[in-house]
From Swiss-Prot:
NDH is composed of at least 16 different subunits, 5 of which are encoded in the nucleus. It is found in: Plastid, Chloroplast thylakoid membrane. It comes from Phaseolus vulgaris. The keyword Chloroplast applies. Gene3D superfamilies: 1.20.5.2700. The gene is ndhF. One of its GO terms (biological process) is electron transport coupled proton transport. This is NAD(P)H-quinone oxidoreductase subunit 5, chloroplastic. The chain crosses the membrane at residues 9-29, 39-59, 89-109, 125-145, 147-167, 185-205, 219-239, 267-287, 290-310, 327-347, 354-374, 396-416, 427-447, 554-574, 606-626, 728-748.
Length: 750
């Protein structure tokens, strides 16, 4: 065991030869390196697999011994300054190492085929491997300086991958947005690190926790400064894990390739913020104000991410807001003191979300044959629908990820999310209500994605399609035309994707009303959550999506197995609550909510809470099915729907309310607009003023002196007439004038 720990420092550096050799090869032998580019996937996966087995061995020893191993090298510069570097192996390191390597390996396998036709294939694998190296270095760091170094390296890799297709202006802007937003959090993190060093004189985790604990217990320090610096440390996690209000970069980060979206959202960048809070939790628990702040930020992020996800058209942005909401659950759990619940959900969510992103990549990959390689079309759920018969395997994989994220047993996220919801009831009733509401919204927006993508018909082909029966109507206006508003008097019940005329619009949530003719039962309908417009084309080629190949399906299959069984690590199969694998791995861990509870599981309470959670989940699924499922395919008599709508729905109020929700969600809560008005526009005006002042004033003075000197020289250059005697005479006169001035000055002074 000691031998294994002594060489743990090598974990982050095992995959390092891959990006180094790719870089050298592209620099010295670019043609030959590009010819054998597909070979580089093998060493990337192989070396990361070695790290995975190393991490598994450490985890097994951790479960058996519950030990903490730290090794530090000290470099003394002088008597006052010394730099210490080392590695820390504990339960948190073991969990994160396994998570990073398993997800990283599967994403690399998937990427080998997904990126095979991309010119930046080698660059992509170099960035991805360096990304994994950075995250492994972060989780094995023993002090805050190392944390900050790898923290910035993670950020750099994420910016490179978000802007991977940098020739696209949208991708370049998304990269810039991620960089600027994270700079705010990273600056706060740096100030917090410097402040903690000023207070404690140490940056080693174990030392600074003990020092601060002693200082607080003896009342020998100002709590204001400790709280301030702890809050600054937390700012780094707020930006990196896309917590409110620094979450705005996350949806735009979807401009990168889909495999990197899976890695960022599952095991690397956004997980880094959760890891940092978990690592610093022994410090934060000493400061109740900080714990309450963490819980508050997490709670806002939970509900904000859920509400912003319900009206997005882009499948990846939908999943991005889903990630934001789930990260809010983890942050909320950490703020409540539920260390185990937060890490449990981090594990289960990572595999489920990786599965969903790889599934969405498979869907996008199949849609590109129909709509081209524009992300605005291939990722747009408006063009999808009816993919069940075209990509059935992908549908099954995506459904498993959807069920897991919704919290349906026996899938992984059910166990972890249910634990957080139970802990929220112990923490505060208000927090519990909001957290449970977000759980219902999660089921709604996830099944919204599933139904829009896989149910119904393939929308891209339906410019003017009618079903065989009048009661089965399906026609859609898809792209590029302006909206035409029509005034109507009667308002009837809404069905998804009904027949519309050219240049008219329908969508997936009631917002505006347009006239439609469908039978005599429904004369006009209202608009649902996002608009679908016309291509302006008369004909479409009858192409259909194809299933992904075996390489991509293999990665998704393994993630399905993880999604099915990884939840078992947190299930107690005996009566003791500390006898499950996760609890053994996390010993010792912080639990502020169950200090006085008995060490036995109350199964009645568990089933009661689980039943309540499932009721909320199924309610969200029902609402999603009500709005988005092709109900017209199953109902022969629409009079019943019209009767229900006429008698029970107050249409005016309903339309107004749904319009508010639509605008809020589709416009990202107006937060980007607020930042644009309050910060960005002001900064731009300041920059323009500085540019004007620099060019017209500073440069103007300098250039004016130069131009004046030039013209003065031109004016007097002919005074001497070109004769040496004239130059000598002028020179003598200048000397005499200088002597006279000097003598005058001396006499006046004395």
């Amino acid at each position: 065991m000691e031998y294994t720990h002594q060489y743990s420092w090598i974990i982050p550096f095992i995959p390092f030869p891959v990006p180094m050799l790719i870089g050298v090869g592209l620099l010295l032998f670019p043609t030959a390196t590009k010819k054998i580019r597909r070979i580089w996937a093998f060493p990337s996966i192989l070396l990361l697999t070695i790290v995975m087995f190393f991490s598994l061995d450490l985890s097994i020893h951790q479960i058996q011994n519950s030990s903490i191993f730290q090794y530090v090298w000290s470099w003394t510069i002088n008597n006052d300054i010394s730099l210490e570097f080392g590695y820390l192996i504990d339960s948190l390191t073991s969990i994160m190492s396994i998570l990073i390597t398993t997800v990283g390996i599967l994403v690399l396998i998937y990427s080998d085929n997904y990126m095979s036709h991309d010119q930046g294939y080698l660059r992509f694998f170099a960035y991805m491997t360096l990304f994994n190296i950075s995250m492994l270095g972060l989780v094995t760091s023993s002090n805050l300086i190392q944390i900050y170094f790898f923290w910035e390296l993670i950020g750099m890799c994420s910016y490179l991958l978000i802007g991977f297709w940098f020739t696209r202006p949208i991708a370049a802007n998304a990269c810039q947005k991620a960089f600027v937003t994270n700079r705010v959090g990273d600056f706060g993190l740096l100030l917090g690190i410097l402040g903690i060093y000023w207070i404690t004189g140490s940056l080693e985790f174990r030392d600074l926790f003990q020092i601060i604990n002693n200082l607080i217990s003896k009342n020998e320090m100002n709590l204001f400064f400790v709280t301030l610096f702890a809050l600054l440390l937390f700012c780094g996690s707020v930006a990196k894990s896309a917590q409110f209000p620094l979450h705005v970069w996350l949806p735009d980060a979807m401009e990168g390739p889909t495999p990197i979206s899976a890695l960022i959202h599952a095991a690397t960048m956004v997980a880094a913020g959760i890891f940092l809070v978990a690592r610093l939790l022994p410090l934060f628990v000493l400061l109740p104000q900080i714990m309450n702040t963490i819980a508050f930020i997490g709670l806002i992020t939970v509900i904000l991410g859920a509400t912003l996800a319900i009206a997005q058209k882009d499948i990846k942005k939908n999943l991005a807001y889903s990630t934001m909401s789930q990260l809010g659950y983890m942050m909320l759990a950490l703020g409540m003191g539920s260390y185990r619940g937060a890490l449990f959900h981090l594990i289960t969510h990572a595999y489920s979300k990786a599965l969903l992103f790889l599934g969405s990549g498979s869907i996008i990959h199949s849609m590109e044959a129909l709509v081209g390689y524009s992300p605005a079309k291939s990722q747009n759920m408006v063009f999808m629908g009816g993919l069940t018969k075209h990509v059935p395997i992908t549908k099954f994989f995506f459904l498993v990820g959807t069920l897991s994220l919704c919290g349906i047993p026996p899938f992984a996220c059910f166990w972890s999310k249910d634990e957080i919801l139970n802990d929220s009831r112990l923490y505060s009733p208000i927090v519990a209500i909001i957290a449970c509401s977000a759980a219902a919204l999660t089921a709604f927006y996830m099944f919204r994605i599933y139904l829009l993508v896989f149910e119904g018909y393939l929308n891209v082909h339906f410019l003017n399609f009618n079903g065989k029966k009048n009661s089965s109507f399906y026609s859609i206006s898809l792209w590029g035309k302006k909206q035409v508003k029509l005034k109507i008097k009667n308002e009837n019940f809404l069905l998804v994707l009904l027949k519309i005329k050219k240049n008219e619009i329908t969508s997936f949530f009631i917002r505006k009303r347009y006239l439609h003719r469908v039978n005599q039962n429904i004369k006009n309908i209202s608009r649902l959550f996002f608009g679908i417009m016309d291509f302006g084309m008369k004909k479409t080629a009858c192409l259909y999506p194809n299933e992904s190949n075996n390489t991509m399906q293999f990665s998704m299959l393994v993630l399905v197995l993880f999604t099915l069984f990884v939840g078992a690590i947190g299930i107690s199969f005996s009566q003791g609550i500390d006898l499950d694998i996760l609890s053994k791995l996390l010993i010792p861990f912080i639990d502020l909510l169950h200090k006085d509870s008995k060490n036995f599981v109350n199964y009645y309470e568990f089933f009661t809470n689980a039943t309540f959670s499932l009721i909320l989940t199924f309610w969200g699924i029902f609402i999603a099915s009500f709005f988005y499922k092709s109900v017209y395919s199953y109902l022969k008599n629409l009079n019943l729907l019209n009767l229900f709508e006429k008698n029970f729905i107050k249409k005016k109020f309903s339309d107004h309310f749904q319009n508010i929700i639509y605008n809020w969600s589709y416009n990202h809560g107006y937060i980007d607009v607020f930042y644009e008005i309050s910060f960005i526009s002001s900064i731009r005006r300041l920059v323009k003023f500085n540019s004007f002042f620099d060019k017209k004033r500073i440069d103007g003075i300098t250039n004016g002196i130069g131009i004046t000197s030039f013209f003065l020289g031109e004016a007097i250059k002919n005074v001497g007439g070109g004769r040496i005697s004239s130059y000598i005479l002028l020179y003598i006169l200048d000397i005499l004038i200088f002597i006279l001035i000097y003598i005058n000055f001396v006499f006046i002074r004395y």
